[in-house]
Amino acid sequence: MMEWEKQLHQLADRLCYLKDIFPGKHEEDIALLQTRLDEIRRKLESCTPDEAQAEMTSLEDLFFFIECKLEDKLTPMDKVRIVRHPHRICLRDILENVYDNYTEIGGQGEHTNDPAMVIARAYITRKRHGKVYHQPVLVMGHEKGHGEEFRNGGSVKPWGNSKALQYMKVAETEGIPIHTYVFTPGSFPIEDTPGAAQQIAKNLYEMAGLTVPMVAVFSEGGSGGAEAISLADRRLMLSHGYYSVISPEGAAAIEGRLKPGQRATPELIERCATQLHITAEDNLQFGYIDRVIQEPSLGARPYHYDFFRTLRQEIIRATDETVLSVRSGMFRGALLRRMSRDDINLDEMYIRWHLSQGARERLVLRRQKKFLRLSRGAYIDRRPFLNKMRNSMRESWGNISARIKYALITKHQRKFAYLMDEMTSEMHLLKRRLTAPFCRIPRDQRPSIEPETVRNLTTLSDWDEESESRKGKWTYISPRAKEDRA
């Protein structure tokens, strides 16, 4: 009986979840589920165990059928409500179910400068030929929690982004990959020094030059707060997530030209959510993300353990692909093709995530080219053709001159200066040896110096003798000294 009550309680939670996601929509399906749930709850009081088991199985099947049916009717705004729901998975769920071990750093819970930013050092365990390998990674992301108010809804303050940047540099020093998870509606609107925009810009500048692999996973990517930790080599996105420069409500306020105190209509918000193209499929088509991770029907929740296994495989695959793409090797192409197969278990493969100096330079160059290409693709250029050609030639010449200046001259300038110092020292030594015979003058040919002059130059003077030689002209007694003597 207690087991059935527990199942009924879980089904009631799923029904409340449907009501929250579809307010005022699909009322017939939701009413059918509510009726069947109440009916079976009454039947359990008088039916036999076999009948109760059959009723619970039929109710489970009905819930599954309705959820799959509603999954096909999801709108962009429905996905926004899924992402914002308290039952949505959070970063702590991912740390507990995707990684084998983790230790939170930079403060825990409320005892940190920003509870909305969680940073942890985690390990992924992989096996090959019976040998176990523990690969360390740095995991960071926005933590919304499940209704925890002190998390501030995942909106990070500037000092939280500063903490993330500090530990990114620590990961670069240790040479371990960085995994970031984006669960934020946007950065917290505060302009205390450093301001939100300034800190995000600093994070972007520093992340563009980090020499370790970076993988970002998007669930809720809102405005610049998402960009503060997501400039990565591989960008993945959950199938029910959204990634937008502004929230649908904010876009509706601008579109409707609302005055203070006014609220946008649900129809306008729905239309703005569709026009913003914020879903995972839209962002994949635009090229802003590299891969979509499929979730269960109506979004992933903490009890969907199969989804966490899928997420683990995708995270490992993205990290391996990033490392192999910049590593030189004869079989690199074959490994990359093998990694793209979905039926392979990456926990039974082992690829070292350590990069050489040359691979790190190629990694940074690839990352910078990727985001420069994305920025050019998002820009509508209406300049005349001749102006485009002239600017393109100027840019090409600037790239060539920069390569000559920095890749050739500046890179070897220190070595050249060291070589010149060594050559100068050797020349001085050679010159001294060549001129040494001419400097050996016989002692009797040196000019003679008067003994009195030698004594004055090589001995200390005596004060009494000096005063007598100067006949007391330098003697001075202050008036105060005369009074003291008297």
Name each model feature, range by range.
Residues 1-11, 16, 182-333:
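Conserved catalytic cores of soluble enzyme domains
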Residues 120-208, 213-225:
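Cleft-lining beta-strand/loop regions that shape enzyme active-site pockets
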